[in-house]
Each structure stands twice: as structure tokens, then as C-alpha cells.
Amino acid sequence: MFANIGWWEMLVLVMVGLVVLGPERLPGAIRWAASALRQARDYLSGVTSQLREDIGPEFDDLRGHLGELQKLRGMTPRAALTKHLLDGDDSLFTGDFDRPTPKKPDAAGSAGPDATEQIGAGPIPFDSDAT
């Protein structure tokens, strides 16, 4: 909850508390805030343990599914589209169409002949009418 508060922010909060509450009421306010946070943390840990007891072994499955949703939540729409629909090939978005795609073996287990094997080791064919 307060993970993003640094030392400078904490110092500013204490100074504002000194101005607003005064030096005689500030220690009591700090004690009250600390006890309220401690009670809230204890309540939330109790709810988690109660839920774990009520649901049983399915609780771990539920946490796994929630973890997967959390991973998807952090993705941008472009990353989700690239990962799930395009199998990680983002050349559609980057315009890098000349990049070789990784070859997947076919059902027989061989990747098939390369384009260099089909052309041969001779000179590169040139068509003067094509240019």
C-alpha cells in the first residue's frame, strides 16, 4: 500500500502533520494510524485463511488462474495480439517483413528443403526484364 512512498514523501507527511495537528497530538495520531493499519492487515490475512479453509484444494487452482489473468492484465493490446494470434511474430507491426521466421517442423518431422538448396550453388538468376 505504501510501497511507493519514499523518505522525502514521508518527511513531507510528518511536516504537514506537525502543522495541522501540532506537536502534542501528532504522536497519538501516528499510533492510531499504525494500529488501524495493523488491524486491517490482520483482518485481510484472516479473510485469506478463512477462504483457503472454505474452498479447500481449489484455492490453489483459483490462485493459478488469477495469476494468469494478472499476466494478461499487464500486456498491451499489441503484445496480447502478437502473442496469441501471431505466435510472437510482430513483423506486421514493425514492418520488418524480410526477417526470417522460425521454421516449424511439419508432421513428418523434417523442415523441408531450403530455398538455397532449390536454387543451387551457381550464380543468382537475374531477369533484365523485371528491373
Swiss-Prot record:
Name of protein: Sec-independent protein translocase protein TatB
Any one GO BP annotation for this protein: protein transport by the Tat complex
Gene deletion effect: Essential for growth.
Gene Ontology cellular component list: TAT protein transport complex
Organism the protein comes from: Mycobacterium tuberculosis (strain ATCC 25618 / H37Rv)
Region (Disordered): 90-131
Leader sequence segment: none
Function: Part of the twin-arginine translocation (Tat) system that transports large folded proteins containing a characteristic twin-arginine motif in their signal peptide across membranes. Together with TatC, TatB is part of a receptor directly interacting with Tat signal peptides. TatB may form an oligomeric binding site that transiently accommodates folded Tat precursor proteins before their translocation.
Membrane topology: Single-pass membrane protein
Keyword match Protease: no
Keyword Transmembrane helix: yes
Entry's Gene Ontology molecular function annotations: protein transmembrane transporter activity
Entry-linked InterPro entries: TatA/B/E (IPR003369), TatB (IPR018448)
UniProt keyword terms in alphabetical order: Cell membrane, Membrane, Protein transport, Translocation, Transmembrane, Transmembrane helix, Transport
Biased composition (Basic and acidic residues): 96-106
Main location: membrane
Family: Belongs to the TatB family.
Matching Gene3D superfamilies: 1.20.5.3310
Subunit structure: The Tat system comprises two distinct complexes: a TatABC complex, containing multiple copies of TatA, TatB and TatC subunits, and a separate TatA complex, containing only TatA subunits. Substrates initially bind to the TatABC complex, which probably triggers association of the separate TatA complex to form the active translocon.
Transmembrane segments: 2-22
Cell compartments where the protein resides: Cell membrane
